[in-house]
């Protein structure tokens, strides 16, 4: 029926503002399309492992929001950039994260299209909010590693265009990093 994405969006907005709404909508749509997996979580008692999983998923989602922005910076989705993200997810988070990450990215691309139709600055505002949350919750070193990942996405197709460079500088500033750090990585 598609109700999970709207419920997730509303709850996400109440809990985390615009970024929370986007995250809730995307995660809710995953439940809508994959309802067999959604039922497996009922009845589980919260444990330390589920707290870690929640933190991991929160970081993974923020990372993918930023990755989607860099991938689409030049107006197209390149196979080489998507393949770079798949390899990174596989080596960092395991095979299960590859499919989950790809679904999230595809949902983010679709969400961006819808947001851009209503307000061309809406997704950019989401990126700013995401960067602010990342700056508040990650150490300098972790933010720098995330920036390296984003720069490598831009480089993965063999050419870093001006739009990608500007998007990288923008993301760096939102995450509390210097534009010079982006320039040194290119």
Q: How should each PLM-predicted stretch be described?
A:
Residues 1-72, 76-186:
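Small-residue-enriched hydrophobic alpha-helices in membranes
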